């Protein structure tokens, strides 16, 4: 198969074909995910929680993100690698450019920034300099202390209206992809229709252009022992991790995941 690029993802959206994304932090899992047909490997700052055992993503550094990106690159077999810029790594224009360069040099094909409409300026700066950006809206874990916990975002009409406006503004600024986390399914569907760029969901219903899960969650592993509402354990009925990965990709591609039970209402 040819390598997955931004053009590939755009074509999948235009053709109505779903995009399968999964978090990945090492070479071995990267290879297995690629063999299962995962389109995008997300080197997420979620590693701070699932690998390092922190109670949030805030302690993760750019150096750690670059290290895991390089690990994933070595095992990658054609997927697009998307890497998170961690907490406060893009607080200024200079930080955004320097830290994005560090991650791209480590092997990322694209970087992800969490926030809202204020991301327009760093996205514009990065896009103009050849760095593809995915904007992350909705529940943004780096802002967990402001949000008051890990809660669904966009349930109030004012919030929903602002999120729709932010999505369109960030596309206009140059964002090449959008990720919506813990957003009411109806709102996510509206945003997906309103923008031309691919929209990936996690806890955002089935109408987005693709889905992403944290690898540990989809394998039934959790430090807390309780999976979020939007997670399905793909190890159930499977005898191997390879089987679970293939089942995840198939379920995303054929639209059977997520089901209505995995989404949120307004």
Swiss-Prot record:
It comes from the Bacteria. Binds 1 Mg(2+) ion per subunit. 3-methyl-2-oxobutanoate binds at residues 45-46, 84, 112. One of its GO terms (molecular function) is magnesium ion binding. It catalyses: 3-methyl-2-oxobutanoate + (6R)-5,10-methylene-5,6,7,8-tetrahydrofolate + H2O = 2-dehydropantoate + (6S)-5,6,7,8-tetrahydrofolate. The active site is at 181 (proton acceptor). SUPFAM superfamilies: Phosphoenolpyruvate/pyruvate domain. Mg(2+) binds at residues 45, 84, 114. Its main location: cytoplasm. HAMAP family: PanB. Homodecamer; pentamer of dimers. This is 3-methyl-2-oxobutanoate hydroxymethyltransferase. It comes from Ectopseudomonas mendocina (strain ymp). The lineage of its organism: Bacteria, Pseudomonadati, Pseudomonadota, Gammaproteobacteria, Pseudomonadales.
């Amino acid at each position: 198969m040819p390598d997955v690029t931004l053009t590939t993802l755009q074509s999948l959206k235009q053709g109505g074909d779903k995009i399968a994304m999964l978090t990945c932090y090492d070479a071995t899992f990267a290879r297995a995910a690629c063999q299962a047909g995962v389109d995008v490997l997300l080197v997420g700052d979620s590693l701070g929680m699932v690998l390092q055992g922190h109670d949030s993503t805030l302690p993760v550094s750019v150096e750690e993100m670059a290290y895991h990106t390089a690990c994933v690159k070595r095992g990658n077999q054609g997927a697009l690698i998307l890497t998170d810029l961690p907490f406060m790594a893009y607080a200024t224009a200079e930080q955004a450019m320097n830290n994005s360069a560090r991650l791209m040099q480590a092997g990322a094909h694209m970087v992800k920034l969490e926030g809202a409409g204020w991301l327009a300026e760093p996205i514009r700066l990065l896009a103009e300099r050849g760095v593809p950006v995915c904007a992350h809206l909705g529940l943004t874990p780096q802002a967990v202390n402001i949000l008051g916990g890990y809660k669904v975002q966009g349930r109030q009409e004012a919030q929903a209206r602002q999120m729709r406006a932010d999505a369109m503004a960030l596309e206009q600024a140059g964002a090449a992809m959008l990720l919506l986390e813990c957003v009411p399914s109806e709102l996510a569907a509206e945003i997906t229709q309103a923008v031309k760029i691919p929209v990936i969901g996690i806890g955002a219903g089935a109408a987005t252009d693709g889905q992403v899960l944290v690898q540990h969650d989809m394998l039934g592993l959790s430090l807390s022992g309780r999976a979020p509402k939007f997670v399905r354990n793909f190890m159930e009925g499977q005898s191997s991790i390879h089987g679970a990965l293939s089942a995840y990709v198939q379920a995303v591609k054929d639209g059977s995941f997520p089901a209505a039970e995995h989404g949120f209402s307004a």
